[in-house]
């Protein structure tokens, strides 16, 4: 994501790398809801529908859940296909929680709803993509939270 919180995090975690910044892995465009809390929007009927997962509702001047999911999935599939084609076996994506939760809900095994993949800032997941499984079923194995809690406590 080109947003500062992602580019700065990437520089801290991987100072020797020259990351490729991909705009289509940005967080959902919340339009006029950006910067407002759920409490601020509590009386907004569209916000309540959006929060309940209605894919047709979008924030004013923003992006619907369906459009957001379509955008990030198209980009993610392109990235995975490129990694498989080049034989790349390790890669990192530094992006936002909403992007991570949505991608894992769409492609992750075990299957879970987006909110079940929530994590604290600075955390993520390690996944394994097996080319044959990906090409057949478009799924990936989610196998650990990173960094592990013990890494932080040391």
Language model feature labels by segment:
Residues 12, 102-106:
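Active-site signature of alpha/beta-hydrolase-fold catalytic machinery across serine-
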Residues 28-39, 81-89, 105-154:
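Acidic, low-complexity terminal tails and accessory targeting/binding regions
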Residues 69, 73-84, 104:
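Generic structural signal for well-ordered alpha-helical scaffold segments
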Residues 48-67:
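Short glycine/proline- and acidic residue-enriched helix-loop micro-motifs
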Residues 1-46:
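Phosphate-coordination/substrate-recognition cap region in phosphate-metabolizing enzymes
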């Amino acid at each position: 994501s080109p947003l500062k919180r992602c580019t700065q995090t990437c520089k801290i975690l991987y100072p020797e790398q020259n990351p490729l910044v991909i705009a289509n892995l940005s967080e959902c465009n919340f339009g006029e809801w950006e910067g407002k809390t759920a409490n601020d929007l509590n009386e907004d009927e569209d916000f309540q529908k959006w929060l309940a997962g209605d894919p047709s509702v979008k924030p004013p001047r923003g992006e619907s859940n369906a459009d957001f999911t379509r955008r990030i999935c198209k980009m993610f599939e392109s990235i995975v296909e490129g990694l498989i084609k080049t034989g790349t076996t390790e890669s990192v994506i530094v992006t936002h929680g909403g992007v991570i939760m949505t991608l894992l809900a769409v492609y992750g095994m075990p299957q879970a709803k987006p909110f079940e993949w929530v994590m604290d800032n600075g955390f993520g997941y390690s996944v394994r993509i097996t080319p044959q499984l990906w090409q057949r079923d478009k799924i990936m194995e989610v196998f650990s939270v990173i960094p592990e809690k013990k890494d932080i406590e040391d």
